Amino acid sequence: MKMYQPFALTLTALLLILSLSGCYTVPITGRTSLNLVSEGDEFQLGMQAYSDAKSQAKISSDPVANERVTRIGKKIAQVSHHPEWDWEFTVFDDPETPNAWCLPGGKVAVYSGLFPYAKTDGELATVMAHEISHAIARHGAERMSQQMVQAAGAAVVAETVANEHIETAKVV
């Protein structure tokens, strides 16, 4: 029977501890998920991504579209689980992109390409609320945590395989 390498055992134990300590219950749904990213780190990443998006994309100068998105967004934010977030709403002038998103901390973007599909305030509110719910439920942090665990698992496998090759070479 082969003995596991100390590195692999240590990393596996660390992953187990992180997995158990990183369990997070989504307040809205009660669903438990793995979350190894702090809310502060998540907000910082969100702020940076929002700033990058605003510097790279064309921001709409349409006062009607901007007022509509801000008005609807503020109503959703007020009844969300995080009305205290520093909510910001931006319309990007991109008629080819029917999309919207919300980053941690309440940074919301709507692309002008969504307006032909979300003609009424109710339709636009549905899309915006859906995107906002992803941020409130911390889905981005959950995905990052899963990627961290996968990367650590891959490191364990790579180290174990490398050590087995070294041991095999010693025998030969």
Each predicted region: which residue ranges?
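A Zn2+-metalloprotease active-site environment signal
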Residues: 4-8, 12, 20-172
